[in-house]
Amino acid sequence: MSIIGIGIDFVEILRIKNIFLKYGDKFARKILSTEEWKKYILIDDSISFLAKKFVAKEAASKALGTGINHQITFNQLEFYKNKSGKPKLRFLKHALKKSKEIQCKSIHVSISDQKLYAYALVILEN
């Protein structure tokens, strides 16, 4: 296997909080997939959840080589955890099509946060 895409991003959690305070759940609906939304409505720390999803999706879109645009939107990049808690990425719609075009066979994800920032790294291999 060889690396075909690397994306890294970080965001100040206060930035996400301010966006959320301005737009509320409209912001959450814009960036979350249907499955992520189902988890979001059940959690207490919504700002941290949104910050990690936002930063991970930015990193994933960079790894795809597209960035977030009119075709590849936030809600087409779905993050979840496997049974052991490892973060995983699922491509949907146009993002899935793009991942097939670049022959993505393996995805590596790391997401972290601390008091002020959230970070993510996504590596795609063929």
Swiss-Prot record:
Binding annotation for Mg(2+): 9, 58
Entry-linked Pfam families: ACPS
Any one biological process term the GO annotation gives: fatty acid biosynthetic process
Main location: cytoplasm
Compartments in which it is found: Cytoplasm
Catalytic activity, EC: 2.7.8.7
Transmembrane segment boundaries: none
Reactions performed catalytically: apo-[ACP] + CoA = holo-[ACP] + adenosine 3',5'-bisphosphate + H(+)
InterPro entries reported for this sequence: 4-PPantetheinyl_Trfase_dom (IPR008278), 4-PPantetheinyl_Trfase_dom_sf (IPR037143), ACPS (IPR002582), Ppantetheine-prot_Trfase_dom (IPR004568)
GO MF term list: holo-[acyl-carrier-protein] synthase activity; magnesium ion binding
Cellular component terms per the entry's GO annotation: cytoplasm
Gene3D superfamilies: 4'-phosphopantetheinyl transferase domain
Sorted UniProt keywords: Cytoplasm, Fatty acid biosynthesis, Fatty acid metabolism, Lipid biosynthesis, Lipid metabolism, Magnesium, Metal-binding, Transferase
The protein's required cofactors: Mg(2+)
Homology family: Belongs to the P-Pant transferase superfamily. AcpS family.
Biological role stated in the UniProt entry: Transfers the 4'-phosphopantetheine moiety from coenzyme A to a Ser of acyl-carrier-protein.
HAMAP family assigned: AcpS
UniProt name for this protein: Holo-[acyl-carrier-protein] synthase
